[in-house]
Amino acid sequence: MKRIKLKYRKLKRQQFIKVEKFNIGIDMVECHRWLENKQESIACAKREGNIVLVEKLAQEIVNSSFGRAVAVQTVASSKGSRSPGLSRESFKTNKNYVAMMATLEQITSNPHKYKATPLSRIYIPKRDGSARPLSIPSYTDRCLQALYKLAIEPMAEEVADLSSYGFRPMRNVSWAVGRVLNGLNNPLANYQYVVEIDIKGCVDNINHQFISQVTPFIPKKILWAWLKCGYIERNSNTLQPTTTGVPQGGIISPLIMNLTLDGLEFHIYKKIQKSSSQSKGNTYCRYADDMVILTTTEETALIALPAVKEFLAVRGLEVKLAKTTIKNIINDRNGFEFLSFRFRKVYRRNRKRLTSQVGIPISAIKNFRKNIKAISKTRKSLDTINDEINAVFRDCGYYYRFAHTSGYVFSSLGYWLWKQFYKHCYKRTKDKFDKANHTKINEIVLSSYFKPIGSGLSTKPFVIDKKGKPHSLFSIRSIEYCPPTYTDSARNAFIFEDSVTLTKVNMRSKSSWKRVILEKWGPCCGLCRKNLEINSIPYELHHILPKRFGGKDTPNNMVLLCKSPCHQLVSSSIQKADVSEIQNYISLGILEIPMDYLENLKTSQSSY
């Protein structure tokens, strides 16, 4: 073990908050257009088998200032940009971003001199009481990983398994749920058994030699520097070695994990076809390192499980025996869990035919209620508690909207939260009175924190902050059931024709609003034209005609914009009264301003 002394910078909260908008003097719209064309060319060349052209195009991305700019912007605009790891350099101003681009140019031009910084390791608690290690690379290492990911992800999409949906562009949980549900509903296959597979520490235990074999294009010196850089735990100065696996927290780690597990679907299929089993039908589905295999008979299931173990052993992995099981779906009324959804077969009302059902597990509902109670017990202002509860509610609602039982569960959760909010407000109000009776406190609570909905007796909780802004409690009942959807054809999100098909599939799981907006604008930011689906960029709905000028909440008055910086730039242009910027956004069709207001702005500027 090596003991090294590190000088940790004491970072104040303000240092994380005051981050400059990304503006390095390069047209980022042009950067993304150039990058998308290069990535499409790489994907097409890979499909045609032209490896020489693939490597040439990938090298152009790595060597280009456009590629470096997109990589730095990806890290700077991500949520993890506030976590420095063991970085000693600052990464919050445009001057820092330009310096990082110069550093990337030096590393890529001479990779043999590159040395990765040790990882900063923290532990995140899991549901079962254990802890998941999260290793955070330095800013330089993250930007370098983002740069090489831009080059190799189009290649990886061409060799990916058809039924792999985790950490892939334009794929999501809906696809995995739809794949399993479609298999269970197949009357010809009549699947009765499921093999639930849980890999033991998948990301942390992959063999480094195997990673080196399956990862294309990245120089071996750089790849091995990432794998062998070691880690330092928080509140410790001891450098621990990394002998296996990739860091959980690295930008390129999910892609490397997918490259490692790709090929498992064909391996299982080949083993079952070569067996003497009379029924060879099976359906495979994988999301990251979680996977299930549906089979018609127990004999086929007993063939599939050893095939998985054999495939994983070559990669230095093994299954967790405690969580790897073979179940009979028909006899087991509880069914099986996959991605926190419960799948089972139930009889229809006529009791003659089995049908498949996707539900929300009771354990997930209990954990959700536990989190809400923990938030409500904190000593924070009511509007802050309200906003935190809304964030949890939205995440839960939009994740589980693919479950058949979502309507019933959301309705009961909404009523439960109404009661929790009432109890919390009642306790806070009761302390302000010495001998007030229940009726008086109840009247004060209902008049202060609840507003009536329509002409009925229903009320909606809301809180007014110190600035007089109302914060209403999100209604989870407003989230409608959305049927899961997927396609089993080989589609590469980086090829335009394929991305159009994938967008149409994803639109089926969107609300009617988003469907209309996507049909009009496509899955791109209205300002920078960045593909939001491929790059998994957080976006917001922007009112083309702002509400202050009479704009309405209708799909035709909405456009998708990157959360940062595009939406901030468009909104701030009105506040700053910048006529040139406003006219530019009007010409792009993402902003409408009344003519008299615009004329007044021009007049006021000319008077100065």
Curated annotation (Swiss-Prot):
InterPro entries: DNA/RNA_pol_sf (IPR043502), GrpII_Intron_Splice-Mob/Def (IPR051083), HNH (IPR002711), HNH_nuc (IPR003615), RT_dom (IPR000477), RVT_N (IPR025960). Its main location: plastid. It comes from the Eukaryota. Its EC number is 2.7.7.49. Keywords: Chloroplast, Nucleotidyltransferase, Plastid, RNA-directed DNA polymerase, Transferase. It is an enzyme of class 2 (transferase). Coiled coil: none annotated. Residues 105-343 form the Reverse transcriptase domain. It catalyses: DNA(n) + a 2'-deoxyribonucleoside 5'-triphosphate = DNA(n+1) + diphosphate. It is found in: Plastid, Chloroplast. One of its GO terms (cellular component) is chloroplast. This is Probable reverse transcriptase. It comes from Tetradesmus obliquus (Green alga).
